[in-house]
Design a protein with these regions (language model features):
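Nucleotidyltransferase catalytic core that binds NTPs
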Residues: 1-140
Length: 140
């Protein structure tokens, strides 16, 4: 039986931090499922100017990456319902979530599922990249 690993996020403006997270997540099991927030979900989380890339574009980008086996788009604010549906063996999150209680981690801990927190590149963030681009354009 294969070991299903699940990771989720916006993955808007794919960057090195995302790649590192996905590579480390794939090392944890046999089959990596990536849940991505829908366009409307990102708008609610990040603001009206987001996402930069629509969900189908982001899905295709992620599927082109070697560690990714499957991508599922979800429209809720969190991935809890998707986790209940796919029943992963391992859930991987960035270490920035280590001290946060989330509906996903609460649910998985009750089921005694493994949660792995991965260190990430602190200087890589889609939001920070967008801010840098705006700042550079303002100076031009």
């Amino acid at each position: 039986m294969r070991c299903k690993v699940f990771v989720n996020g916006c993955f808007d403006l794919l960057h090195l931090g995302h790649i590192e997270l996905l590579n480390k997540a794939k090392e944890c099991g046999d089959y990596l499922i990536v849940g991505i927030n829908s366009n409307s979900s990102i708008k609610n989380l990040k603001g009206p100017s987001r996402p930069i890339f629509n969900s189908q574009y982001r899905k295709k980008m992620l599927l082109a990456l070697d560690p990714v086996d499957e991508v599922i788009i979800f429209s809720e604010a969190n991935a809890l319902n998707l986790i209940k549906k796919i029943k992963p063996d391992i859930y991987v999150k960035g270490s920035d979530y280590k001290n946060e209680k989330t509906p996903e981690t609460d649910f998985l801990l009750k089921l005694k599922k493994k949660i792995i927190y991965v260190d990430f590149y602190k200087n890589y963030s889609s939001t920070n990249i967008i801010a840098k681009i705006i700042k550079k354009n303002d100076k031009a």
